[in-house]
Amino acid sequence: MDIKNALSRIVGQLDLTTEEMREVMRQIMTGQCSEAQIGAFLMGMRMKSESIDEIVGAVSVMRELAEKVELQSLDGVVDIVGTGGDGANIFNVSTASSFVLAAAGCPVAKHGNRAVSGKSGSADLLEAAGIYLNLTPTQVARCIDSLGIGFMFAQSHHSAMKHAAGPRRELGLRTLFNMLGPLTNPAGVKHQVVGVFAQTLCRPLAEVLQRLGSKHVLVVHSKDGLDEFSLAAPTFVAELKNGEITEYWVEPEDLGMKSQSLHGLAVESPQASLELIRDALGRRKTENGQKAAEMIVLNAGAALYAADHAMSLKAGVELAHDVLHTGLAWEKLQELGAFTAVFKVENEA
């Protein structure tokens, strides 16, 4: 099926099959479609609403075309990632949580990019922290195998995305591609916490990952609108485990934490996010630093559970709390900076 036929179907509010979606996505991602066609396709898909079959097809093509990171083992390797677009401009919770995971001995293959609508994307934060981003897949694998954490800069691993960049930018709206990033980890992780910008996406994306072979995933959206677990409101979870999907709400109190306002956790820049994270991961904390630490503990705990590194969400949160207060997570961030600096010298020689 070519994109013109697909557009005719979509205008008629008809879904594409998984295979038809694969064909159209392959045309888009290999430069066979005009920008007008891509923009029309993305807008039509949004107005129709993307089906699970269509998302599965799109994800499978992006994974196929990605520059992959080959790890010695995927057992227990986790990613904690969000779609973004929640409008809250909270500091980089998932990226900070990744260093707590690594300090706990849980390997992390972190996938991320620069900010699109927010103030600080994961790549922006890590760059502000002095971490070199332009790594080869082999170098990323060495980071994960040696330190227990590595960062995969999305634009380096999904170069085929450049064909859709113009239409996406000019549309200025959330499209299918906003959902695809968290589902296309170049290391092929089977354990994830995926934050989404709308509760209605939780179950569908859990079903997509179920069909694509994921093992243990939490797809989450908080009642106060965050694409992660919130301290200020209940969080809705669609959990994929043992091939089954269950849905439930989680209150901070269910996990031994206290509900509190998120006031003071919004940031205006990557540097501000880094300063708050340094405060949160350090031994002495300001009031906002303590609150940020609890937000990190909540989300890192969920990822420890998704990685099967903890037996329950509550046990994961307890472990994350203990690890964060050792100061080892901040040390892990500094280790990654030093480790990648060597690769920078190699790559720029």
From Swiss-Prot:
* Pathway stated in the Swiss-Prot or TrEMBL entry: Amino-acid biosynthesis; L-tryptophan biosynthesis; L-tryptophan from chorismate: step 2/5
Q: Please list the residues that bind 5-phospho-alpha-D-ribose 1-diphosphate.
A: 82, 85-86, 92-95, 110-118, 122
Q: Which reaction does it catalyse?
A: N-(5-phospho-beta-D-ribosyl)anthranilate + diphosphate = 5-phospho-alpha-D-ribose 1-diphosphate + anthranilate
Residue positions annotated to bind Mg(2+) 2 are D227, E228
The record, for Gene3D superfamilies, names: Nucleoside phosphorylase/phosphoribosyltransferase catalytic domain (3.40.1030.10), Transferase, Pyrimidine Nucleoside Phosphorylase, Chain C (1.20.970.10)
Q: Can you name a GO cellular component term?
A: cytosol
Domain of life per record: Bacteria
Q: Which family does it belong to?
A: Belongs to the anthranilate phosphoribosyltransferase family.
What is known about what this protein does?
Catalyzes the transfer of the phosphoribosyl group of 5-phosphorylribose-1-pyrophosphate (PRPP) to anthranilate to yield N-(5'-phosphoribosyl)-anthranilate (PRA).
Q: What is this protein called?
A: Anthranilate phosphoribosyltransferase
Q: Which organism is it from?
A: Pseudomonas putida (strain ATCC 700007 / DSM 6899 / JCM 31910 / BCRC 17059 / LMG 24140 / F1)
- Which gene is annotated as encoding this protein in its UniProt record? trpD
